[in-house]
């Protein structure tokens, strides 16, 4: 019986045109997928683009076009490049596609119904370049740009609830994260308190995203 093998690249941001880093990553994934098929396994290779967020919205504004038009043009650049490089991906996902948005909303409803999403007002340091809140330690590392203090209400996923389960799963499944030094790196990270994850942005600040199915004021 053939083994199944699934490989995905990151879904690339479309705030700018594709570059050699995108090509390098996708070629590596393509080689791995082709190898799996060559040895008789059923391989599925996914790549795509992340079309939502503040950076994309601002990039479209700078170009004087609406966000969807900007995304359409950038997505075409990516697919054209993969064709030129003879990349053999089985699918190409865009986060603006209805099939993607439908699944996102379904998962959000499942997690929310399970009681793992809550609303809270948060005040902290926000990195515009990374589009997320960061810690004081991260702000002092010099790795983050465009940092500002921000206070707003958002929705959070109770990631801290699953910290022990994550550690147990990684320890009980030695091949879950490879290579070994990356597994140890993640386990080292999980020894620290795991903060809950902010999963929303208010539409008053950012409206280019997938609307939360349980609160239309947020994406």
For each predicted feature, which ranges?
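N-terminal Rossmann-like or analogous alpha/beta NTP/dinucleotide-binding catalytic cores
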Residues: 2-119
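Structured secondary-structure scaffolds
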Residues: 2-47, 99-103, 142, 147-219
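Short clusters of hydrophobic/aromatic residues that line enzyme substrate/ligand-binding pockets
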Residues: 56, 60, 127, 176, ...
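Short secondary-structure capping/junction motifs at helix and strand boundaries
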Residues: 86-94, 112-125, 137-138, 149-150, ...
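Short beta-strand element of the conserved SAM-dependent methyltransferase core
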Residues: 125-127, 157
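Short cysteine-rich clusters marking metal-coordination/redox-active sites
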Residues: 127-129, 139-144
């Amino acid at each position: 019986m053939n083994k199944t093998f699934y490989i995905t690249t990151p879904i690339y941001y479309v705030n700018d045109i594709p570059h050699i880093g995108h090509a390098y990553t996708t070629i590596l994934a393509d080689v791995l997928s082709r190898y799996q098929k060559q040895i008789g396994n059923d391989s599925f290779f996914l790549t795509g683009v992340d079309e939502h967020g503040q950076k994309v919205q601002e990039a479209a504004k700078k170009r004087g076009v609406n966000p969807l038009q900007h995304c359409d043009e950038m997505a075409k650049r990516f697919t054209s490049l993969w064709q030129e490089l003879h990349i053999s991906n089985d699918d190409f996902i865009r986060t603006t596609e209805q099939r993607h948005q439908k699944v996102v909303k379904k998962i959000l409803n499942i997690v929310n119904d399970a009681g793992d999403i809550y609303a809270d007002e948060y005040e902290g340091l926000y990195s515009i370049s990374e589009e997320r809140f960061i810690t004081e330690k991260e702000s002092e590392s010099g790795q983050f740009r465009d940092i500002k203090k921000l206070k707003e209400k958002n929705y959070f996923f109770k990631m801290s609830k699953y910290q022990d389960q994550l550690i147990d799963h990684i320890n009980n499944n030695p091949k879950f994260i490879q290579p070994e030094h990356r597994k140890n790196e993640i386990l080292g990270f999980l020894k620290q308190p795991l903060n809950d994850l902010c999963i929303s942005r208010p539409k008053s600040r950012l409206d280019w995203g997938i609307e939360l199915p349980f609160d239309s004021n947020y994406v």
